[in-house]
Amino acid sequence: MKEKLKINVTKPQYVQVSDITYAQVDSWYDHCRRDLKLDLIYPEDMSDKRYPCIVWICGGGWIRMDKSAHLSYLSTLAHQGFVVCSVEYRTSNEGCYPMQIEDVKAAIRYLKAHADRYRIDKEHFGAMGESAGGFLTCMAALDHDKARDVGEYLEESSSIQAACPWYPPTNLSTFKYKDAEECAASMESLLLGYNIMRNIKEAYNSSPVSKVTKDAPPFLIIHGINDQTVPFEQSEELYDKLIENGCDADLIALEGADHADLQFFQDELWDRIIEFFKIKLG
């Protein structure tokens, strides 16, 4: 069969760029410098349209991370009209908190400084992340301490306008350990650089729940009820704190879902995520 078909162009071309250096940081006992990188998916066409940006922050217990994880899923957001960025951050093997949130905020500032190049609407930024990345998503939304902004592009704001954390640790002072020795070796203590059982107040003050104010951006929190790694109550506590402060917040409790289960990658849930970002980021 021979057929002539006329196709109207209604969608832009989507460009994926990997390993963009957004910052250089000290490494190996401050004797060297290394690049921090991000991956980006953005639309490219002949118009001057700008698109909201969603920053993805992967998990890994703060001890390992791979910014390329889930890029195939993240492309779904790009096709819904968002610029999507997956950001590398330093792990607790390289340094303690707040190093990790400093990296995330540096990436946000870099993207805003290069908004024209990547077709970004710099006034409409969201963040989404899983587990350890969910913690950093919360802190990107809630921690406005100017001391967290270090490095380049300090003329740009690192603030975001919407947050979607998945199964996030939100109160590092309430994780349960059988004894101080187990606590000292925990991912939470390694992140903070001290034994949490012996520094409860400090751990609380380094947690998202301690940073909630009435000025928090909208939140969509997603957590599996059967999570055996980060208890569901962690998200409930953050949600309750947001509501107490009059903030815009929703909590989706996934029935039967454990930590990072396949339920988090089903179309039904992603439709809710896309709807959230479209409404909150315009």
Question: Residue ranges of each PLM-predicted region?
Answer:
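Alpha/beta-hydrolase superfamily serine-hydrolase fold, recognizing
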Residues: M1-G282
